[in-house]
Amino acid sequence: MASELEYESVLCVKPDVSVYRIPPRASNRGYRASDWKLDQPDWTGRLRITSKGKVAYIKLEDKVSGELFAQAPVEQYPGIAVETVTDSSRYFVIRIQDGTGRSAFIGIGFSDRGDAFDFNVSLQDHFKWVKQESEISKESQEMDSRPKLDLGFKEGQTIKLSIGNITTKKGGTSKPKTAGTGGLSLLPPPPGGKVTIPPPSSSVAISNHVTPPPIPKSNHGGSDADILLDLDSPAPITTPAPAPVSASNDLWGDFSTASSSVPNQAPQPSNWVQF
């Protein structure tokens, strides 16, 4: 059944090949093309290599009609079905067979060395593929013969999964995770934002407050005008050191007191006239 499903594929086609009758081999040494009548081939035609499954077929056909002249099945290469001669790379010896099982050895040759190279490589590639297929099939059979590992659950078997602080098991419920006291933190202000400083409270004293210096008073309570007039007097007026003024006195109160006392003082026209 498998052979019926296999299809035939063409591996190589060469339009010009010569066929020679070869003398029987007298010893174990290889065939020599110089023993053949190379200038008088017994048949010329076309060579075609096909494959069906693992077997390759060398077919000698007529150039015009394509009628089959001879066929050589090849099950192994290199092997007895195809041999190379010892004195040339363009000639080979193949074993042909007919439908009745009879076989014979004939010589074939190519006029071009490149055609002989393609003939040789086509057979090598085919049997290399056959070898790889055999190894793959053997490995697959070994895999099938090995005991399979049963990873399934047995009857009534359960499992327990632990994910972080949440424990889940059959028939149970998961407990919600409580947030810790130090879990939350304030986010920093966005870039470019302004930080507003709150104003100080009324209960906080201002440390940089400066107490204004006291203003000395004259012994007779004169005004600012009197002080200017006294600059031209011949003898300076010495006044005793004023009593220290407390920080609670208002600076503007002293000025108002001096201004209010100006009308009560008598002007000194003599000193102003001399100036």
Curated annotation (Swiss-Prot):
Its main location: membrane. Transmembrane segments: none annotated. A motif (WXXF motif 1) lies at residues 252-255. Pfam families: DUF1681 (PF07933). GO terms for biological process: endocytosis; protein transport; vesicle-mediated transport. Residues 166-190, 215-275 are annotated as: Disordered. Residues 167-179 have a biased composition (Low complexity). The keyword Repeat applies. Involved in endocytosis. PANTHER family: ADAPTIN EAR-BINDING COAT-ASSOCIATED PROTEIN 1 (PTHR12847:SF15), ATP-BINDING CASSETTE ABC TRANSPORTER-RELATED (PTHR12847). Belongs to the NECAP family. This is Adaptin ear-binding coat-associated protein 1. It comes from Bos taurus (Bovine).
